Amino acid sequence: MRVLVLGGGVVGVASAYYLARAGHEVTVLDRQPGAGLETSFANAGQVSPGYSAPWAAPGIPLKAMKWLMMRHRPLVLWPRLEPRLYGWLAQMLANCTEEAYRRNKGRMVRLAEFSRDALRELRAETGIAYDHREKGTLQLFRTRKQLDHVGEDTSVLDEYGVAYEVLDEGGCIAAEPALARVRGGFVGGLRLPGDETGDAHLFTQRLAAICARRGVSFRYGVTVARLRHEAGRITGVETGTGEVLTADAYVAAMGSYTPALLRPLGLALPVYPVKGYSLTLPVTDESAAPVSTVMDETFKVAITRLGDRIRVGGTAELAGFSGTLRGPRRATLERSLRDLFPAGGDARQAQFWTGLRPMTPDGTPIVGPTVYDNLYTNTGHGTLGWTMACGSGRLLADLITGRAPEIAHEDLSGARYLKAA
């Protein structure tokens, strides 16, 4: 079967890998000059099934109001006359119940655990190297209140058999020795030993090279203008130059830009671009740098070790498709780094970056078929595209091939999210 994958980020390239492995003839289209140059370029670097959770949670509306007032706020909302944003926010608020949170977190953890295992298998199959480490994630709590609420997450982790450790200050220092330098600045943490870290951009580029050697065609610098359709099927992809490309099946994996592509087909995806920022800086003192990933719960910032670099990523800015780099967001990232790893790296040498995370209101991605019988979606992963990429690609390849998927998937499919526009 000939398959066109629209989008060359980590999710699209992982989809191409598993489709090619299943024996399909695959072509990937992307508007950039190479793979992984948009949202996958400089994300936080976490492969974190244990930390997979929806932003929509009990208490979030009140917390969000508090965050919006903070100087170093993890959430930024730019007032906009954009009905789609406010509709998306309303859907998110509707998912802030205890019942919805447990349901959404459960399916996210299920996909993320499957994806982490698929990544490990892919690594064994290919020998791919991408500055990965298998040393877990430490969610760090600065306040007793944060630590006292950890049971809300561990109950779901128990349900899905995800390993974890609740640590006191000494336990956190044992996991991340450099934190001894800031003893007293935190009270405890939640360690997720099964989590990993790695450079998503490097992974995407090297996996694309592996795919190319296995016969996958990559066409870069190609803009997808629209999808042609007839009688409930997609009949072709029209590019920005007017060229029409055809296939037997089509995968929409264009991140935050997927809804605009599908809207003319009468499909409305509840995916909104949530802007994130990162700093990437060289390690200046090995003993003062993180070992793996430390999640600063107060500022919602991830500080990750990637080889001889430190990646500091975070913030959630609701500003449409703006790519503007904003100084206050950099200040927040630098503040978190300075508080926890003040001597680990030199922020003056940091590369400052921003990307658009494709978020659904309930945190769950949209992976599976649509009402068009040869059109599939693989988008809406939010902050967890790197975590869920391999599992989503493998699941999608099974669905397109007609094989029974290895995990429950009905609640991940387009039928749950797609509706008539």
Curated annotation (Swiss-Prot):
Its EC number is 1.4.99.-. Gene3D superfamilies: D-Amino Acid Oxidase, subunit A, domain 2, FAD/NAD(P)-binding domain. Keywords: FAD, Flavoprotein, Oxidoreductase. This is D-amino acid dehydrogenase. It comes from the Bacteria. Belongs to the DadA oxidoreductase family. It holds the Pfam family DAO. It comes from Methylobacterium nodulans (strain LMG 21967 / CNCM I-2342 / ORS 2060). The gene is dadA. FAD binds at residues 3-17. HAMAP family: DadA. GO terms for biological process: D-alanine catabolic process. InterPro entries: DadA, FAD-dep_OxRdtase, FAD/NAD-bd_sf. One of its GO terms (cellular component) is plasma membrane. Its cofactor is FAD. Pathway: Amino-acid degradation; D-alanine degradation; NH(3) and pyruvate from D-alanine: step 1/1. It catalyses: a D-alpha-amino acid + A + H2O = a 2-oxocarboxylate + AH2 + NH4(+).
